[in-house]
Amino acid sequence: MLHTLHRSPWLADFAALLRLLSEGDELLLLQDGVTAAVDGNRYLESLRNAPIKVYALNEDLIARGLTGQISNDIIPIDYTDFVRLTVKHSSQMAW
C-alpha cells in the first residue's frame, strides 16, 4: 500500500499511520508532510524503525527550504516517480 502524508506530522494522526504500516508498504511525504524528513526529529526516528521505504517529493522539499536538512534515509523523488508509485500500488491511504 502507498501511504501519503500531506500534513505536518505534528498535526496528523501519526500514531495511527505507524500502526497501519505493513512490511512492503511505502510512504510518500509531500506538501507539509516533508517536515517528517528533517534529520533528527522524533517522527523520523519512528519511520526508521518501520519496515517501509520513505520518499519525499523533492519539489516540496525545495519549496520549504529543507533540501539540505533531510535524512539520508529519505529518498527524494520527483513527480514522475510519484506517478510510478501510484501505479505500483493498487491501494493508497492519504494522511
Curated annotation (Swiss-Prot):
Transmembrane segment boundaries: none
Major localization listed first in the record, in broad terms: cytoplasm
The encoding gene: tusB
Lineage, highest ranks first: Bacteria, Pseudomonadati, Pseudomonadota, Gammaproteobacteria, Enterobacterales
GO cellular component: sulfurtransferase complex
Organism superkingdom: Bacteria
Alphabetized PANTHER family for the sequence: PROTEIN TUSB (PTHR37526:SF1)
UniProtKB keywords: Cytoplasm, tRNA processing
Presence of keyword tRNA processing: yes
Protein name as it appears in the record: Protein TusB
UniProt xrefs under Pfam families: DsrH
